[in-house]
């Protein structure tokens, strides 16, 4: 059924965001603006560093550049609107705008989840079968894995978005959140949302279980391989290689699991908002910091660039 047939084309929503704390609007704006600026500079900077340094043209850094791009994208989908709503009184968003925001946000979050799983598999091949690493992780395979992650992200998002377009809304629609979350739309709809809820549950469960299964299986083999190494320096190097990725995975999946384990009650809305801020705004900022601060190649490239700029003047 077409969108106009459901009388939703002119529907608007009000995003409450953090309006419960009017005295914190300006401080929150300044904090989130700083975080978003660091996110943009960090992720774009990491992509540029990987691009200009031939030493970083490896599968691991190829996946890392894609992760930085995804982090930049899904943060940019949420943060600007959230920042605007912190300083203006009119916090409305059209139904179409809400659906578009959800579509792109869902696409990039699902893509990130599978990219992290792909990166775990890459570490598994590099540590457990290093002699055949360049053969097994060919450029063609790397591109296919990334394209597959994006394609699945778009597919999941399309299914949920199409189901949202069939919903009907009436009256005053207030979303007690700072972005258009799918479950929030379902709670406001006057349509039967049974199928939508099951579709959301199925896709979320499948994505989380499948990606975590890949990650846990990969790292189980990695741990066994590392423990079999006789060289202490070899063990230390292997653990160091995986530390950044494990940190990123723990923060990302830990936050999402915590978020969806919180009971959907009025008393938990504050907790849900805080957790949502963490994985929509904070995590995209942390990822480039996590990977660059613990990575000698990245730090060396940054040092070379800075030295070149200094001596050029």
UniProtKB/Swiss-Prot annotation:
* UniProt KW keywords: Cell membrane, Disulfide bond, G-protein coupled receptor, Glycoprotein, Membrane, Olfaction, Receptor, Sensory transduction, Transducer, Transmembrane, Transmembrane helix
Q: Which residues are glycosylated?
A: 7
Q: What is its main location?
A: membrane
Which pairs of Cys residues are joined through disulfide bonds in the record?
98-190
What biological-process GO terms show up in the record?
Answer: G protein-coupled receptor signaling pathway; sensory perception of smell
State its role.
Odorant receptor.
Q: What is this protein called?
A: Olfactory receptor 5D18
